[in-house]
From Swiss-Prot:
This is Flagellum-specific ATP synthase. GO terms for molecular function: ATP binding; ATP hydrolysis activity; proton-transporting ATP synthase activity, rotational mechanism. The lineage of its organism: Bacteria, Pseudomonadati, Spirochaetota, Spirochaetia, Spirochaetales. Belongs to the ATPase alpha/beta chains family. It comes from the Bacteria. The gene is fliI. Pfam families: ATP-synt_ab, ATP-synt_ab_N, T3SS_ATPase_C. Probable catalytic subunit of a protein translocase for flagellum-specific export, or a proton translocase involved in local circuits at the flagellum. ATP binds at residues 167-174. The keyword Protein transport applies. Keywords: ATP synthesis, ATP-binding, Bacterial flagellum biogenesis, Bacterial flagellum protein export, Cytoplasm, Hydrogen ion transport, Ion transport, Nucleotide-binding, Protein transport, Translocase, Transport. It catalyses: ATP + H2O + 4 H(+)(in) = ADP + phosphate + 5 H(+)(out). Signal peptide: none annotated.
Amino acid sequence: MEADLLCKYEVALRESEPVKYVGHVTAVRGLLIESRGPHAVVGELCRIVLRRQGRPLIAEVVGLAGSTVKLMSYTDTHGVEVGCAVVAEGAALSVPVGDALLGRVLNAFGKAIDGKGEIYAPLRSEVLRASSNPMERLPITRQMVTGVRVLDSLLAVGCGQRLGIFSGSGVGKSTLMGMIARNTDADVSVIALIGERGREVMDFVAHDLGPEGLKRSVIVSATSDESPLARVRGAYTATAIAEYFRDQGKQVLLLFDSLTRFAKAQREIGLASGELPATRGYTPGVFETLPKLLERAGSFSMGSVTAFYTVLVDGDDLDEPISDAVRGIVDGHIVLSRALAQRNHYPAIDVLQSVSRLAHRVLGADMKEAVRIVRRALAVYAEVEDLVRVGAYQQGSDAELDRAIAMRAELERFLTQGAQERVRFQDTVTSLSMLTGLSIAQPPSGV
């Protein structure tokens, strides 16, 4: 017993650091702070002592060059001067996790910003974690119900699937995210608002999400006026919180807005650290970081994280670098059309340009056939829509086109849905059955 006790203290003494290694700031270059020492590793937190303000500034090691440590602050660098002491904290960024987070709005570092008091959670989780072993992932066979008619039928989503929502500005992606968060059958929703305007955060919480959606949600906000490192770490914080609830056996929905602003923040960090710009000014580190973040969602034995990532498409160009890179990583993409939005067609989902790569695994045979009929009708009508509108098409010339025209009005009603309208899954199946004339005997597997 005494030997075990002595062994415990011996280990504690061996791992303790009675002497703190202290470095000193040597230069401040824009976002980047350079110091000589201390001994630290990339990703480690450091405390910069501001001599004139009497408070510490928390920064993170983003690069090393010989004895020079390159740091980036989580806040602005006001008050930093040459000679300020830099102390390594010996740990990376971690955030509190637990049920106490539900219904709360947090900043990028897991601290409450909603005025409801401090969050007391006994557990903490590091935000920078490696993605799981691919052999630990489970096949995706169960459908997640979103409460959005077009997604639950024509673009079915599986539990653990990752989808990109591609959209220009002002086309309704925040409204669509709010609809999904309110109506989903997921146990917990984690919502990351990265790089948003401050006004939009409150608008989303009050109007798009609402009190009902907030009860089972955790919101992580890192607004556009915060440092690029705070915006990037906010993305990882939201993902780490989602992983915690997944490990508790929950089916988790992760809504991320927006991946483009995350990429731009990562670009700022890369440029400040000395990376050379590549495609459209994005540094190579951006394209290295995207899969590391996105691969953390998925289906596992404990639970699943189903993720929707919005991509703000510059100039409505779906082939711009970030859109192209994300489309190659996710398991499907939902394209929001400005033309549909201008016609007051909401949600403005362009079904023909959108695809769910795992829909065939979660839909039953009857649903697959109904979806095939609807998509075919949409495609046939789209080919000759201009001719039909100007009256140049003569009815009876093409039987398939005649059927598509006859279905058009009902299709429009099926594809549109009010922002506050909640559609039960069985009602979606019934509507699809009436639209196609098929008897859908069984719902998608797992529902």
